Structures are given as structure tokens and as C-alpha cells.
Amino acid sequence: MEPPHILIVDDEPNIVMSLEFLMRKAGYRVSIARNGTEALEAVDQTAFDVVILDIMMPDVDGYQVCRHLRQRPDRAGSRVIFLSAKSREADIEKGYEAGADLYVPKPFSTRQLMQQVQQLLPPSA
């Protein structure tokens, strides 16, 4: 059985690098999208187990990517974690309304994030 496949979507290179390192170290397959447009293409081509998604990106924002993903019945199994500096209650609510499974405000604990990813994955993963 293949390891879980994680898509990391963020326009901040340092966050992408550290998350990619942690996810690969944990044994996950990792794909990267550096903006919302790349994320839309990626979710159209591949069913990911977990999508870690920034909200504020220059082209297509994370809310739009999440809504797009949720409109695809063949991607119903994909779990979405918003990782964002937008931490007001209204922003968090908007994230859940867009279809997020989890909303993690930046700055975040990488250890906690890894635990949360593990909890969102099916037990066999």
C-alpha cells in the first residue's frame, strides 16, 4: 500500500520547505503547489489524502481552492487543513464554511500539525 499523499499549498518558500521536510521524514508522499492556480491544477489531476492550504495567495485564494475541491465528488476523501495567518474568528468560520476539516492559525507548532495530519488520515494510513 502506498503511503498517504499530501499536497502543500503555500506561497511562502520557508513554510513549504519545512513542511515538505517534516512530511517526507514521516514517510508521506509530498507534492507542492506554490500558489492557488497550481493547487487547482494539482487537485484536478490527483486525489490527495490531505491538502495543507494557505489562504492568502496572490492569484487564487485558499478558500476558492477548498470550495473547488469540495465540488468534486471524486475528491470527497481529501482532507483539508487551512494553515493561515488569518486568525480572526470570522476568518476561521469562513474556512470551515468553505469545507476545511481543520483550521490552524500561523504561527503553528509543527509537532501539533503532524499529529493533526495523522488524526485526519484513515486508520490504515
In which residue ranges do the predicted regions lie?
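Short hydrophobic/Thr-rich beta-strand motif most characteristic of the beta2 strand and flanking loop
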Residues: 27-34, 42
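Receiver (REC) domain active-site loop signature in two-component systems and cognate sites
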Residues: 57
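Active-site beta3 strand of CheY-like receiver
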Residues: 47-52
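Active-site residues of response regulator receiver
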Residues: 54, 84
